[in-house]
Curated annotation (Swiss-Prot):
It comes from Agrobacterium fabrum (strain C58 / ATCC 33970) (Agrobacterium tumefaciens (strain C58)). Its cofactor is Mg(2+). This is Nucleoside diphosphate kinase. One of its GO terms (molecular function) is metal ion binding. It catalyses: a 2'-deoxyribonucleoside 5'-diphosphate + ATP = a 2'-deoxyribonucleoside 5'-triphosphate + ADP; a ribonucleoside 5'-diphosphate + ATP = a ribonucleoside 5'-triphosphate + ADP.
Amino acid sequence: MAIERTFSMIKPDATKRNLTGAITKVFEDNGLRIVASKRVWMSKREAEGFYAVHKERPFFGELVEGMTSGPTIVQVLEGENAILKNREIMGATNPAQAAEGTIRKSFALSIGENSVHGSDAPETAAQEIAYWFAETEIVG
């Protein structure tokens, strides 16, 4: 098994409900180490840039609005097969379809307010990490 890094985000719907610690605990309890973390309030430009891949999707405006509505925790997680493990821990995008014990089943309010984001592939992880962090900010 390979030690890898992935990008993780705790979204405003969760931070506004003071769930940062509870969600962080789930990552750590499942063997993922937080090697970089910061609290940001995304600007419209940052949200549009980060989610540019969804620009033509009908939910893009709502997504940007939600992501700029409050503080967000951006993180780099490290561990064995971190990308897959994080995706399993998060659960399905739609919390109604997420497995019991996953972050989204436990904390998400809806498909639009699903509490967390995580990279889906090594290339995406590298891009998303670089969007928010300089290499010197990742210590682990």
